[in-house]
């Protein structure tokens, strides 16, 4: 589907309203009620990959430089919630931000690099 398709926009709105966690560390779990490695009843763990996919959507639909602020937010979120080693895990504790599950997870690193690349490409478009 095209990123501007109404169905995609509705999906993103649902992610923002129903999936995005508001426990203090923010982030996006895989799906509503995800219990894999659950740390706190009733709150799913945020995953790097799903959170970065949300950032990638915003990079794709950005129409002006200010629209990239949310992408910057999620890139900074990733850095803030990574250990000093820079190794990214699969998911995070929803309250403490502690790394959980598979560590390191190449997929998490790949999506971070991909998001940075998308950000830079879009930023370059605006700089022309």
Predicted regions and their residues:
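Extracytoplasmic/secreted proteins, especially bacterial periplasmic and envelope-associated proteins
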Residues: 53, 70-73
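Internal helical hairpin/lid segments
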Residues: 42-60
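Short coil/turn linking the two alpha-helices of tandem helical-hairpin repeats
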Residues: 62-63, 120
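Extended glycan-interaction surfaces of carbohydrate-active proteins
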Residues: 1-48, 73-128
